[in-house]
Amino acid sequence: MRVLPFLLPLIPVLLATTITDLPELVVVTVATENTDGLKRLLESAKAFDINIEVLGLGEKWNGGDTRIEQGGGQKIRILSDWIEKYKDASDTMIMFVDAYDVVFNADSTTILRKFFEHYSEKRLLFGAEPFCWPDQSLAPEYPIVEFGKRFLNSGLFMGYGPEMHKILKLKSVEDKDDDQLYYTMIYLDEKLRKELNMDLDSMSKIFQNLNGVIEDVELQFKEDGTPEAYNAAYNTKPLIVHGNGPSKSHLNYLGNYLGNRWNSQLGCRTCGLEVKESEEVPLIALNLFISKPIPFIEEVLQKIAEFDYPKEKIALYIYNNQPFSIKNIQDFLQKHGKSYYTKRVINGVTEIGDREARNEAIEWNKARNVEFAFLMDGDAYFSEPKVIKDLIQYSKTYDVGIIAPMIGQPGKLFTNFWGAIAANGYYARSEDYMAIVKGNRVGYWNVPFITSAVLFNKEKLEAMKDAYSYNKNLDPDMSMCKFARDNGHFLYIDNEKYYGFLIVSDEYAETVTEGKWHPEMWQIFENRELWEARYIHPGYHKIMEPEHVVDQACPDVYDFPLMSERFCEELIEEMEGFGRWSDGSNNDKRLAGGYENVPTRDIHMNQVGFERQWLYFMDTYVRPVQEKTFIGYYHQPVESNMMFVVRYKPEEQPSLRPHHDASTFSIDIALNKKGRDYEGGGVRYIRYNCTVPADEVGYAMMFPGRLTHLHEGLATTKGTRYIMVSFINP
C-alpha cells in the first residue's frame, strides 16, 4: 500500500494526541528573593495545577545584575546540587523557568503533549531568541535554522532527568559566570549537542521569549474567553512566556490576562476573592502634595476630611508650596488638625522641592512605623470616602504592595496610569488602555506607570528610599515608577469601582498669575462638576424637574434660584477688585457706537475676561429654564453682547429710569442681600404695575426684553446693591 505524501505530516500529530503514558513533569526555578515576579509565576502555575519547586530562597545573590551585565552562574550551581536525585530519572521531564519574569498559560499535560507533538525525538529543548547574548561574536557558529529564531535563551528549557543532570554537571561554574553563555557553549559544541540531543524551540511552539519580538506576540481569546498568547510571525500559540531583557513591561501586560487571570467572557478571574477584613485598624500615613497651582483645593481637603478612616489612626503629611493654597491648608488644619495621630506640615514658600518632599515623606512615614502609606496629589478628588479602606483590603487580599485607584479627567481619556511605555520612557497607549479606562475590562492591572494617588504597603514603603530621586532627569512620579520597574516592584491600577476624578489644572496657573481674586470662577470648562457644586444654587436642579412649576413674581417674570451665594460674593469681589466702573453717563467707549441710552454704573464681563465662561454658563443653565417657561422659543447657543454687573449706591446712581432691554429675554441676578448690605431696591414692571423685591441672593429674574416688559430699577436708599444683568439673544 502506498502512503500519499501529503498525509505524512499528519502522522506525528496523530501519534502525539494519542499518547497517554506521559512522563512526570517537574518544574523548578531559582529565586533568592520572594519578589512580585516570583509571586506571579507561582500564581500562574497554580492556576494550571502546576507545582513549582523554588530553590535558593533566602540565599545571598552573587550572580550579578543580569539585566545589564553577564551573570547568573549561581543558578547553575544551585540547580546542579538539586539535580542529583534525577540523575537516572529517564521517565521524568524537568523544566527550568526563570523566576521573576515568566508566566505559565497551560497545564502539564498540554505542555508535554506539545513537546511530543513537535520534539518527540529530542532530549533537551531550550527557548530561542533573536539576539546572540552575551557574546555576539559567537553568532556565526550557531547552526542555521530553516525557520524561526536561531539563538539560545536560557530562561526557559526542559529535558529528561539524565540529560538535565549531565548538562548541569559538564563544567564547574562560578556564581558570577554567565548562565546563558554556559549553555550556549555546550549547544555550539556539535558533539555535545548531538550527544545530549539538544534543540531550540525556534518557532515558539512551547517557549516564548519576548525580547526583540514583542510586536509579533499578541493577546487573543478563545471562544470560551480563555486568554492565549499568539505569535503572529510563526502562527504558534506558546504556552510559557518569558519577559527577558527590556520586554518585561510587555510581559506585565500579557500577564494581566494569561495564567487564567482575565477571561473575555467571565472577566477578572482573580477578583472577587473573599476580602480579608479585620477588626484591627492599622496606623497609616496620608500624604498630600500640592506643588503646582490646582483649583478647588478646598473641596479636595473637604473630601480628605470625610475619608472613612479614623483620623487618630492617620499620620498626616502635607506639602504645599503654592501661595494661593496656603489659607486652604490653614483652614483645614484649624478644623481637623488636632484629630490626627500626628502631622508634619510644610505650607508656603519653602526651599524644599516637590521631589525632596516626597522622599522626605517616605522616610517620615517609615519613622512613624505605619502599615500603609497613601500618597496623593492635590489634583486627586475622591468622592468615595472608603478609598483608603478599599485599597488596603485589596492590597491584603490580592497580595499587591503598590496599588492606585483609577481616576481620570471627566469626559476625557486622561487618567493616572499608563498602559504601556515607549522606548524613551514616556507614555505609549496599550491595546487595552481604552477598555480599562471605559470600564469594559475591570480588575486590577499591572502597569508601568501610576501617579496622583498611590498606596504602598509597609514592605514596599521600606524599599522606596530615594525612589523619587532615582532618575532626576524625570519628573518625581516617573522616577519612582522607573525605580519600581527596574527593581521588580509591580505597579497596579484598580478600576473595580468609581473612586473620583482628576482635577484639570493645566491652564490654571495662567489664571492665577493674571491676578484673579477667585480664579476657580474661570474653571467652568475645565472642571465643570466642581464648578457647579460650588457656584450653582443648590435649589437649581429642583426647578428642572419635569413636574416643578417655576414661580412667576409678575406676569412672565420668572423668579428662580440660579447662583450660589458664594458665587455672588466672589463676583462682587472680582468686580470691585477690577475697579473700573463706568461713570454712568451716556458716553461709553466700550460699546460699538460709543453711546449708551440707559446708562448704569457697571463693569462688563468681557472687561474681566469672563465673557466666554458666562455665555457657556447661560447656554448650559439658563437656556433650559427659558425653554421650560417660554415654550416654543429655541435659540442655541444663546448670544449676548451685554453682560455686566451693575452697582447702585445712593450717592452714586441709586436707581434706573423706565426702559426696555435690547434683548429677546433678559436675566437679572441679585448678588447681595437686602437688609444686610443695602436698603430699598427692587424692580417695577410698569405695564403690570408689579414690583419684585429681587432680594434673594443668587435668584434670577427672567423676563421678555424689547416689547412687553417696560421696567425700572427702584432706588437704593442705603448701602450698595449689586445685580448681574444679561441681555440674551439681542
From Swiss-Prot:
The keyword Nuclease is annotated on this UniProt entry: no
Glycan-carrying positions: 689
Binding site for Fe cation: 659, 661, 711
Annotated signal sequence range: 1-16
Region (Accessory region): 281-507
Effect of residue 453 to I: Loss of glucosyltransferase activity
Protein's job: Multifunctional enzyme that catalyzes a series of post-translational modifications on Lys residues in procollagen. Catalyzes the formation of hydroxylysine residues in -Xaa-Lys-Gly- sequences in type IV collagens. Transfers galactose onto hydroxylysine groups, giving rise to galactosyl 5-hydroxylysine. Catalyzes the subsequent transfer of glucose moieties, giving rise to 1,2-glucosylgalactosyl-5-hydroxylysine residues. Essential for normal biosynthesis and secretion of type IV collagens. Essential for normal stability of the basement membrane.
Alphabetized UniProt keyword annotations: Dioxygenase, Disulfide bond, Endoplasmic reticulum, Glycoprotein, Glycosyltransferase, Iron, Manganese, Membrane, Metal-binding, Multifunctional enzyme, Oxidoreductase, Secreted, Signal, Transferase, Vitamin C
Organism: Caenorhabditis elegans
Catalytic activity, as annotated: L-lysyl-[collagen] + 2-oxoglutarate + O2 = (5R)-5-hydroxy-L-lysyl-[collagen] + succinate + CO2; (5R)-5-hydroxy-L-lysyl-[collagen] + UDP-alpha-D-galactose = (5R)-5-O-(beta-D-galactosyl)-5-hydroxy-L-lysyl-[collagen] + UDP + H(+); (5R)-5-O-(beta-D-galactosyl)-5-hydroxy-L-lysyl-[collagen] + UDP-alpha-D-glucose = (5R)-5-O-[alpha-D-glucosyl-(1->2)-beta-D-galactosyl]-5-hydroxy-L-lysyl-[collagen] + UDP + H(+)
Transmembrane segments: none
Gene Ontology terms, MF aspect: iron ion binding; L-ascorbic acid binding; procollagen galactosyltransferase activity; procollagen glucosyltransferase activity; procollagen-lysine 5-dioxygenase activity; UDP-glucose:glycoprotein glucosyltransferase activity
Listed cofactors: Fe(2+); L-ascorbate; Mn(2+)
Broad class of the protein's primary localization: endoplasmic reticulum
Membrane topology note: Peripheral membrane protein
GO cellular component: collagen-containing extracellular matrix; endoplasmic reticulum; endoplasmic reticulum lumen; endoplasmic reticulum membrane; extracellular space; Golgi apparatus; rough endoplasmic reticulum
Domain notes: The N-terminal domain mediates glycosyltransferase activity. The C-terminal domain that mediates lysyl hydroxylase activity is also important for homodimerization.
Outcome of mutating residue 682 to D: In let-268(mn198); lethal effect
EC number(s) per entry: 1.14.11.4, 2.4.1.50, 2.4.1.66
Paired cysteines (S-S): 268-271, 554-690
Binding residues for 2-oxoglutarate: 590, 648, 721
Subunit annotation: Homodimer.
Entry-linked InterPro entries: Collagen_mod_GT25, IPNS-like_FE2OG_OXY, Nucleotide-diphossugar_trans, Oxoglu/Fe-dep_dioxygenase_dom, Pro_4_hyd_alph, Procol_lys_dOase
Required for glycosyltransferase activity as annotated region, ranges: 20-280
Name of this protein: Multifunctional procollagen lysine hydroxylase and glycosyltransferase
